[in-house]
Swiss-Prot record:
GO terms for cellular component: small ribosomal subunit. Pfam families: Ribosom_S12_S23. This is Small ribosomal subunit protein uS12. It comes from Micrococcus luteus (strain ATCC 4698 / DSM 20030 / JCM 1464 / CCM 169 / CCUG 5858 / IAM 1056 / NBRC 3333 / NCIMB 9278 / NCTC 2665 / VKM Ac-2230) (Micrococcus lysodeikticus). Residues 111-124 have a biased composition (Basic residues). InterPro entries: NA-bd_OB-fold, Ribosomal_uS12, Ribosomal_uS12_bac.
Amino acid sequence: MPTIQQLVRKGRSPKVVNTKAPALQGNPMRRGVCTRVYTTTPKKPNSALRKVARVRLNGGIEVTAYIPGEGHNLQEHSIVLVRGGRVKDLPGVRYKIVRGALDTQGVKNRGQARSRYGAKKEKK
């Protein structure tokens, strides 16, 4: 425990909190422009072609973001909304694109968990 004299000299340093989505700079979401849309393969036990996009955020930071759901309409220069949230089997992918916002369309014929994928309720 420090003495009062040591506290007068040095003071207490605040705890540094590490953020899991630093590119968002404390915001829940950021807007960005797709610079490249492509597919990658996941880590060892899994096998697929995962859809990802390289996105330049408004602050000028470039991140790799996952495109959730089946099928998408994204291409280069699409304006997207990016949120935090990593994809466990894709190393380096720490962001996800919000479906149904800005240029991204919702998932077609989605029945359950529709709000996560920007899908409207189907007419009976």
